[in-house]
Amino acid sequence: MKRPSRAAILTAAVVAALAGCTGPEEPLRTHQSLPEQPLFRSMRPADRPDAPAFSGTSLAGKPLSLAGHRGEVVVVNAWASWCGPCRAEAPALNRIQRKLGDRGVRVMGINNDTELGDARAFEGDYDLGYPSLHDPSGKQFFKLPKGLVNTQGLPFTVFVDRAGKLAGAVSGGVSEEDLDAILGALLKEKAGAGQAVEALG
């Protein structure tokens, strides 16, 4: 008998979690925060808190805020140039922005480099097609609900639904396969409806 693929297993778990079949912060995986085995925590629609008011100055020196993307599904990724897993996942995040941008998905980075030049070099090396806040002190991280994600390690990623609510988070690196599954479920939710309206096929 053919074994289900990793993508199929993750898709089923994500859909169940986002549809409200699990607890507000139930871990779908319990491995260490590694690029290959991230820890994903989902939030039931009815239990989702407002997303933090991430805002500040981008690496390009321009104002940038999460509030400017209300009505879109936003992937907020915390990274630094010295972080190996951050380098590993950057191409996947870039592809997701280009692939799903016209469907209402936006990727927004939060960079933790002390030196702005290092962050800009990383941005150039990977030709990132999305903006990042420069947050050398990590103050943006403290805006997240306690226990949602491990803010002491990088990378981590949080997902914001169209209503501006926190839908889930990943501690550790995330793959394009994982992003497709999570975002596919969120894109099928109605803005402000508080429920997943379809399951992924």
Residue ranges of each PLM-predicted region?
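N-terminal targeting signals for export/organelle localization
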Residues: 1-53, 193-201
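A short beta-strand-turn-helix
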Residues: 45-48, 53-74
